Curated annotation (Swiss-Prot):
Record-linked PANTHER family: CTP SYNTHASE (PTHR11550), CTP SYNTHASE-RELATED (PTHR11550:SF0)
Protein name per UniProt: CTP synthase
Binding site for L-glutamine: G366, L394, G395, L396, Q397, E416, R477
EC numbers on record: 6.3.4.2
Any single GO BP term: 'de novo' CTP biosynthetic process
Pfam family, one: CTP_synth_N
Quaternary context: Homotetramer.
GO molecular function list: ATP binding; CTP synthase activity; glutaminase activity; identical protein binding; metal ion binding
Amino acid sequence: MRRHPQTATKHLFVSGGVASSLGKGLTASSLGQLLTARGLRVTMQKLDPYLNVDPGTMNPFQHGEVFVTEDGAETDLDVGHYERFLDRDLSGSANVTTGQVYSTVIAKERRGEYLGDTVQVIPHITDEIKRRIMAMAEPNADGRRPDVVITEIGGTVGDIESQPFLEAARQVRHDLGRENVFFLHVSLVPYLAPSGELKTKPTQHSVAALRSIGITPDALILRCDRDVPEALKNKIALMCDVDIDGIISTPDAPSIYDIPKVLHREELDAFVVRRLNLPFRDVDWTEWDDLLRRVHEPKETVRIALVGKYVELSDAYLSVIEAIRAGGFKHRAKVEISWVGSDDCQTDGGVASALGDVHGVLIPGGFGIRGIEGKISAISYARSRGLPVFGLCLGLQCIVIEAARSVGLTEANSAEFEPGTPDPVISTMADQEHIVSGQADLGGTMRLGAYPAVLESGSIVAEAYQSTKVSERHRHRYEVNNAYRDRIAESGLRFSGTSPDGHLVEFVEYPPEQHPFVVGTQAHPELKSRPTRPHPLFAAFVKAAIDYKEGELLPVEMPERVSNGAERRDQVGQSIPEPANRG
């Protein structure tokens, strides 16, 4: 009788060594895509060793974006990679942090569930980690179990914070049997230019550190800026005691969407299914090859300005970037991102310099007052020139503030930025007021996750979605103040989508006869975009940018309101010269 009967679900762990930011998440995502293309059901999970319960309150400059799942969990940005490569929605259980694990264990101790035991890292913390790992193998809503669970272990081998997670993974292999668990280790093979050599010692030491805690990797991903020669692969296989078929060279790829092809060329997917005795078929490249043609063979190029507060770290807008690029794939267009700090747009000269040669302006989400006037100035500049504008979350709120100021509410602002403003056109949501006032925790308390919306028939957004009923993910505490709807509408801005009860403004836009494309959404549609299924709003935005570039649109006439609300019309194009380089 087998001591470890084959399980219905196999587990594959991805760890990293030598250095951080080697691409463990993209490696895991790409392998997941390959196994999915072989007909297997795959789900993924990220284990994060930090003590935060979730990244929701972390500084974007430190952590990057917060990826919100359908069920409202604030998760690591790698979960976004998982969803995009697998083309499936994941839940909050796809991200486990040390903070979550310790919170659960301490709560159990307070309830007396450990019956007087001394609570320790082993077994109590590791058992809780194992419970969360094994929960990923449970049947989903349709009663089907995944064939493979891919679990990425954050951090680097040797970090103190990662040790409980690595120990838990080791125990999973012990509990389920070696034939049911696979360890993949991502390591750096640096190239020393002065000597012209690739060095294998860092990888050997990284694997030695992993083996010292009881884990022998089944395969190694060798990260390098060039291909690793066969002779060095053989040396690494010998010194690290890894099958030569499991030594995978992964030089830097032109695009992240090329990585599945790189891994397949090295036959990693075949090695995994053979080792885990998985049923499989040949890889179906139909959809992915079409994507790669769109990535590498664009028919045109457009420039989109991303006017944000955190542009020094592109990871703060990772899903936004991928969604814009996917919108370009839809139209066989390459999207070049022009990174614009919103602080740089606060003066007329600054905004003209930053946006003078772009074909579209995207205003992403964010928090806090810094840079807000620059975002509003960018919207005014774009409106006066027929330049397409797309606002996300805070971007919608800035569009509304700009519209309100244009009809005489010169002190219009958000309660977030100016609590004492006489015209709070953006107000705190009723169920968030006690949180904003400091009477409750900030973490995990925003309006989070998927919510439905009803769109106005014939609107730009309804035409883009090809539907009047949609659902999008959210992450916010503030909303359009309904007391100002009628006054704001005097600017021409339409409230083209609301919550089903009509209370919460979800989408705004200017009619095409007033401006070709100014659209804002309170949601974060970038979180649902896929490279093979671009989000319709991003596709529509990129199409508007293409039309702007091709049409060389003339400036539009805008009504200007003086402080008493009276209207004065100026032909903007007569007073402000056209940008010199639009193509």
